[in-house]
């Protein structure tokens, strides 16, 4: 009986810990993807300012993998 109570208690504590790690991981993923998108947009903006033409936007999309670029 003590083993069963111990196992159940252990399961409850581990479930709470895993839930917190999952929630914090999801929040971190959202913020890191937002930062990556902003950096990609900045790189694409500097590239398009230095050269002109539709091929430049294609190169930008291939390099940045940024869905905000035209044609991606």
From Swiss-Prot:
Q: State the source organism's domain of life.
A: Bacteria
What would be an example GO MF term here? Answer: toxin activity
Provide the disulphide bond pattern: 60-65, 61-69, 64-72
Principal location: secreted
Compartments where located: Secreted
Q: What Pfam families has UniProt attached to this entry? A: Enterotoxin_ST (PF02048)
The protein's job, in short, is: Toxin which activates the particulate form of guanylate cyclase and increases cyclic GMP levels within the host intestinal epithelial cells. Highly toxic.
Per the record, the similarity remark reads: Belongs to the heat-stable enterotoxin family.
Q: What is this protein called?
A: Heat-stable enterotoxin C
Source species of the chain: Yersinia enterocolitica
Q: What is the lineage of its organism?
A: Bacteria, Pseudomonadati, Pseudomonadota, Gammaproteobacteria, Enterobacterales
Q: Which gene encodes it?
A: ystC
């Amino acid at each position: 009986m003590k083993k069963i109570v111990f196992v159940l208690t252990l399961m409850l504590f581990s479930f709470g810990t895993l839930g917190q790690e999952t929630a914090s991981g999801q929040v971190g993923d959202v913020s890191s993807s937002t930062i990556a998108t902003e950096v990609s947009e900045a790189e694409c903006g500097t590239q398009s300012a230095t050269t002109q033409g539709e091929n430049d936007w294609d190169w930008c999309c291939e390099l940045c993998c940024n869905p905000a670029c035209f044609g991606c």
